[in-house]
């Protein structure tokens, strides 16, 4: 079931970014046609439900966070697109990767080959990249619009905040954000190639506001190791081992 109130938030996104809903729906239909089977949610729930989950973004603080993250091998790591490269370069395999396929495709494929579950998001601007999803071993499709067929809607807008919405939807007891900075600097792993920085920052601001909205509805303990987010408790990386055992 889609999060209560999400449709209103989705309409805000369409209006604020001038997105074409027809293209959004078309993209979801194309992704649905590429997916051979519908990945069962219990495969994800086994990694998330009633567990402490790390959500890892590609913000500037990610690089300095990696030595701490490597200490928590047994905990589920849900990773936003670009951060996948940073983790794999440091011998950390994501459990789940949330991507709209604009990250480094070689590392996304490596994650899939290492048994990561790939959550591929369809939107109006990535239709030409959706065929990449065919090569992923374990793949679930998502949309911000109405779910159907093999396509789900857990909520969320950017890869980073979609990770949090996913963890919340599937019943994580504690969600800890790492590398989720939502600041004015873009991390080196955040996006491949040329992009519009102003639009990128606008998307990050929207993602942050969605997490603040989610925090008012979530039953999970919510923490961030980076810049403050309303509804999330701040915790230092050095104190994580006291919190998580």
Predicted regions and their residues:
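N-terminal donor/sugar-recognition subdomains of glycan-related enzymes
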Residues: 1-53, 63-65, 194, 208-245
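Short glycine-/acidic-enriched loop or helix-start segments at secondary-structure transitions
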Residues: 64-67, 88-89, 107-109, 129-130, ...
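Glycine-rich N-terminal segment of FAD-binding domains in flavoprotein oxidoreductases
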Residues: 56-69, 76-88
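Active-site phosphate/oxyanion-binding loops
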Residues: 179-211
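Amphipathic coiled-coil/heptad-repeat helices and related helical stalk/stem segments
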Residues: 40, 62-65, 80, 104, ...
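Acidic/Gly/His-enriched mid-domain segments of enzyme catalytic cores or analogous surface patches
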Residues: 13, 30, 35, 47, ...
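Short, basic, glycine/proline-bearing loop/turn elements
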Residues: 49-55, 70, 145-152, 192, ...
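Glycine-rich anion-binding loop/nest that anchors nucleotide
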Residues: 55-60, 159, 174-188, 224-226
């Amino acid at each position: 079931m889609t999060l209560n109130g999400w449709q209103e938030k989705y309409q805000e996104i369409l209006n604020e970014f001038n997105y074409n809903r027809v293209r959004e729906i078309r993209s979801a239909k194309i992704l649905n046609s590429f997916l051979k089977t519908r990945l069962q949610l219990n495969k994800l729930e086994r990694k998330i439900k009633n567990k402490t989950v790390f959500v890892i973004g590609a913000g500037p603080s990610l690089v300095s966070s990696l030595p701490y993250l490597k200490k928590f091998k047994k905990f589920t790591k849900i990773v936003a697109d670009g951060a996948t490269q940073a983790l794999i370069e440091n011998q950390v395999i994501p459990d789940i990767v949330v991507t709209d396929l604009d990250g480094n495709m070689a590392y996304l494929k490596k994650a899939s080959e290492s048994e990561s579950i790939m959550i591929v998001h369809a939107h109006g601007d990535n239709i030409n990249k959706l065929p990449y999803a065919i090569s992923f071993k374990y793949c679930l499709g998502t949309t911000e619009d109405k779910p159907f067929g093999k396509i789900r809607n857990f909520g969320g807008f950017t890869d980073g905040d979609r990770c949090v919405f996913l963890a919340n939807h599937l019943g994580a007891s504690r969600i800890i954000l790492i590398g989720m900075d939502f600041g004015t600097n873009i991390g080196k792993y955040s996006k491949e190639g040329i992009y519009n920085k102003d639009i990128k920052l606008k998307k990050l601001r929207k993602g942050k506001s969605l997490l603040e909205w989610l925090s008012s509805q979530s039953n999970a303990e919510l923490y961030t190791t980076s810049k403050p987010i309303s509804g999330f408790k701040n915790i230092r990386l050095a104190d994580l081992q006291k919190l998580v055992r």
